[in-house]
Amino acid sequence: MGGISIWQLLIIAVIVILLFGTKKLRGMGGDLGSAVKGFKKAMSDEDKPADKKDADFEPKNIEQQKTEASAETTAETKKDKEQA
């Protein structure tokens, strides 16, 4: 009564297979599956705390900054001399 019977579903499935073909249906199913998998992965990644840092926010004392700066300038001057 008002519902779709198994025979009607089978007829609709046969018509869909005839219209689209099995290869295209298989491809669409694979695309749908990968989209659902990607969505689930994104949702699970959102729940985990972010351990990765986007930038270096650790405080450094002045001596560390001077040492790093002098090492960078030394490397740059060596590179400039090699190119010349």
UniProtKB/Swiss-Prot annotation:
It holds the Pfam family TatA_B_E. The keyword Cell inner membrane applies. Residues 40-84 are annotated as: Disordered. The keyword Nucleus does not apply. Keywords: Cell inner membrane, Cell membrane, Membrane, Protein transport, Translocation, Transmembrane, Transmembrane helix, Transport. The chain crosses the membrane at residues 1-21. It comes from the Bacteria. Disulfide bonds: none annotated. One of its GO terms (molecular function) is protein transmembrane transporter activity. Its main location: membrane. GO terms for biological process: protein transport by the Tat complex. Residues 42-66, 75-84 have a biased composition (Basic and acidic residues). GO terms for cellular component: TAT protein transport complex. It is found in: Cell inner membrane. It is a single-pass membrane protein. Belongs to the TatA/E family. The Tat system comprises two distinct complexes: a TatABC complex, containing multiple copies of TatA, TatB and TatC subunits, and a separate TatA complex, containing only TatA subunits. Substrates initially bind to the TatABC complex, which probably triggers association of the separate TatA complex to form the active translocon. Part of the twin-arginine translocation (Tat) system that transports large folded proteins containing a characteristic twin-arginine motif in their signal peptide across membranes. TatA could form the protein-conducting channel of the Tat system. This is Sec-independent protein translocase protein TatA. It comes from Vibrio atlanticus (strain LGP32). The gene is tatA.
